[in-house]
Amino acid sequence: STLIDARTQELVEARDEISSSIRYAAKLQKTLLPKSFPGDIDIEVEWRPRDLVGGDIYFIKDFPDKVYIAVVDCTGHGVPGAFLSIIARSHLDKAIRENENQTAGEYLSEVNELLRATLSRADQSNTNEEGFDGGVCIYRREARTLEFAGAKASLFNVDGEEATEVGGDRKSVGSSRIPEGFKYATHYIKRPSGAFV
């Protein structure tokens, strides 16, 4: 009985330590999410991860002439998805730093190449299908144009009572199944009234 009690106590302590680490990781992951949104654009976000940490993130980068917006659903749940979301977030930033003058499709294509390179270095056998599904938008303020590129994701533009779906490409970002050099399509929406991804 004392052996069983001791083993039970060890398991409880291990569980508590893991739970504490995951709660702290969730707090760290939240710091990657935008704290504020551009004042001239109505942006609403509902972020309710299934687990404390996971692979769902959103990203906003505001410039005087344009705004980059991304919604990302990384493969995997829990801790693996969270790690992948950190890598994806890093590449979303890097692709903008490398070229601020790109279309949404070029931007998503660059993120795809960066993620593929990172994942192929991590797993030489490349048997897993890590990556993400999601959409990126670039809103150009002066032209009042929204560009959209999607990876197994769609954008919906709601105008009054009519909703129009703009489908993305049927290829996940980072997937080893995508031909090298694949380019995501850019879709243009003039004066979007109620677009959401």
Regions found by a protein language model. Give the residues of each.
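… and, occasionally, acidic/histidine-rich disordered N-termini of signaling adaptors
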Residues: 7-194
